[in-house]
Amino acid sequence: MIHESAKQKSKSYFDSHRKSRLAHGGYWRHDYRYQLEEIGRIMPERLIDIGCGPGAFLCLVEETYPGIQLNALDISPEMVRETRERLSDTAVATVGDSEHMPLEGEQYQVVTCNMSIHHYPHPQDALNEMYRILKPGGALLLNDMDCAAPIRAVANWVFPRLPGGDVRMYNREEIERMVRKAGFQSVRYRKISPFSFQCVAKK
């Protein structure tokens, strides 16, 4: 019940914050350049952003690499609507649960997930799904919060009390373990700011 309530809180919060600076990635745009660099090395035909919010990251992908077929998934219908309005007509944005994606397997060369996994009650299920929808040889580009242990402990106490559906902040060992358990290989984890990380892994 607690987990389902976290999902509902997340959906309701982001539905009502469609135009906010936070929803548009204002606090985390610094991290996007690292994700864009990895995309540039791969140059996939198809990419999907999981937990896309209002499409701020995908707008940058579209501007930087206009030839990529862009796809998006978010649990919030309002965020999906915003994404559809901001991207070109060729982009596909879907309402769906990251832990149970309404998507066929082995479709994408790249799966991105930016500042979203800390909202998932069952992150292992979400990572398993990301692995499933990736083509063999495809890449996961995961970006989320990474803070010192005392800050993380406080955050994990506060998160369930916040309105946004935040569930848990994970440390490096937890992220690497879950990513590998999903089946990914060549896992690379690095700090990209005092408060965030990037994890790149291959299927």
Named regions from a protein language model:
Residues 118-119:
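A short His-aromatic
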Residues 1-42, 56-60, 79:
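Conserved class I S-adenosyl-L-methionine
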Residues 124-136:
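A short glycine-rich, Lys/Arg-flanked "PGG" loop and its adjoining helix->strand segment in the class I
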Residues 112:
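A conserved beta-strand element that flanks and buttresses the S-adenosyl-L-methionine
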Residues 48, 54-100:
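Class I SAM-dependent methyltransferase SAM/SAH-binding core
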Residues 24-25, 141-182, 187-199:
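C-terminal alpha-helical "lid/dimerization" subdomain adjacent to the S-adenosyl-L-methionine
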